[in-house]
Amino acid sequence: MLHKKYRPNVAAIIMSPDYPNTCEVFIAERIDIEGAWQFPQGGIDEGETPLEALHRELLEEIGTNEIEILAQYPRWIAYDFPSNMEHKFYAFDGQKQRYFLVRLKHANNIDLNKHTPEFRAYQFIHLKDLLKKIVPFKRQVYRQVIAYFKRDGYL
């Protein structure tokens, strides 16, 4: 059996500024794959902590890192890239992620074009509608992380 290689990565479940009064999460549609909606996420650079990577990735991807950190998933969680996907990260079989639950402080600060755009559109959607919008190969990870934050009373 071959040893799989996973790219270290952070991901953010971003609650709207109205949280906890409204339970809506931020998702964005990838610019390179039409219809592929997901949470913001990105690689951890060498020497960077997951928290540092989170702030950098949010600034790069959504134009703001003005967030309040609510909780962190306690373990790394991995997923494999689908076999039919062109591997942007061909040296890796998938990604291992550290998830953060955060609240966005100001929705009007979102700017998908602040850096090199990775997303074409974004929306805040109710948690119950989330999995219908997400690419299938990420759904199990999303289910697991959402269930954890629900059990802990955050969602």
From Swiss-Prot:
One of its GO terms (cellular component) is cytoplasm. A motif (Nudix box) lies at residues 42-63. One of its GO terms (molecular function) is mRNA 5'-diphosphatase activity. GO terms for biological process: mRNA catabolic process. The keyword Hydrolase applies. Keywords: Hydrolase. Residues 5-147 form the Nudix hydrolase domain. Its EC number is 3.6.1.-. It comes from the Bacteria. It is an enzyme of class 3 (hydrolase). Accelerates the degradation of transcripts by removing pyrophosphate from the 5'-end of triphosphorylated RNA, leading to a more labile monophosphorylated state that can stimulate subsequent ribonuclease cleavage. Belongs to the Nudix hydrolase family. RppH subfamily. PANTHER family: M7GPPPN-MRNA HYDROLASE. This is RNA pyrophosphohydrolase. It comes from Helicobacter pylori (strain G27). The lineage of its organism: Bacteria, Pseudomonadati, Campylobacterota, Epsilonproteobacteria, Campylobacterales.
